[in-house]
């Protein structure tokens, strides 16, 4: 809370460059940033605006990608493709979503033909309903199995924090909450290490009566950003970057 999507993206880009001091910001050849709801503080071509706000020279171009759940992945593969064909040597790819500021579907106006002509089913417009249809199609994916997967995911995440495996990829960011005021966020929003099967079993299924999708076994509504530095092998070796 109390943050902007573009500022979250700026924090990620600046943190990325701080961790790679051998990279001259002026050498960045492109910035591809994904966002699903491209409006408000994550509109205005978020790739270009985040590049400028991050302090990159105005000679560095940027563009935005809208591919919903696969947006940031598409940013990475698009930049990787540009590098593989020789269009770029070094560039930044990432994504941002501030679901606290922009609930899913905010400001959208789906064409009536989608439903009138049965181009898609009505429940295709809501991800939770789509998830219920997946349970219908694959009956072996029971609610108990989904709950157990969710619980194990939470437990593995908690252990990864204890082992220090996640912190190296995080960038501390200022955030504000009604309870604590301004704080520094050092942990992702999603982890709930106290998750139990009993607790998950008691959650409501908001997308269908007696359904299988709950707030505990589905994707969270989070605010966050990510950025990655991509380079050709030759450029990485030239700059002495660690190839991952």
Predicted segments — roles?
Residues 25-34, 61-66, 91-97, 145-152, ...:
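Beta-strand segments within the central parallel beta-sheet cores of soluble alpha/beta enzyme folds
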């Amino acid at each position: 809370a109390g943050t902007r999507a573009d500022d979250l993206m700026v924090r990620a880009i600046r943190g990325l460059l701080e961790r790679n001091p051998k990279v001259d910001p002026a050498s960045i050849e492109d910035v591809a940033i994904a966002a699903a709801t491209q409006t408000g503080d994550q509109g205005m071509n978020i790739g270009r605006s985040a590049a400028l706000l991050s302090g990159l020279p105005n000679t560095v171009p940027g563009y935005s990608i809208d591919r919903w759940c696969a947006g940031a992945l598409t940013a990475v593969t698009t930049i990787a493709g540009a590098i593989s064909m020789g269009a770029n040597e070094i560039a930044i790819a990432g994504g941002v979503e501030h679901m606290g500021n922009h609930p899913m579907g905010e400001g959208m106006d789906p064409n009536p033909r989608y439903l009138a002509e049965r181009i898609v089913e009505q429940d295709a417009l809501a991800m939770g309903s789509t998830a219920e249809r997946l349970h219908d199609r694959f009956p072996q994916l029971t609610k108990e199995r989904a709950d157990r997967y969710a619980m194990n995911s939470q437990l593995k995440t908690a252990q990864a924090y204890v082992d220090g495996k996640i912190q190296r990829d995080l960038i501390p960011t200022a955030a504000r909450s009604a309870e604590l005021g301004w704080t520094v966020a050092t942990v992702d929003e999603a982890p709930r290490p106290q998750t139990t099967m009993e607790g998950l079993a008691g959650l409501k299924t908001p997308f269908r009566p007696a359904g299988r999708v709950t707030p505990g076994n589905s994707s969270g509504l989070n605010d966050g950003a990510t950025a990655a530095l991509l380079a050709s092998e030759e450029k990485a070796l030239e700059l002495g970057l660690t190839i991952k």
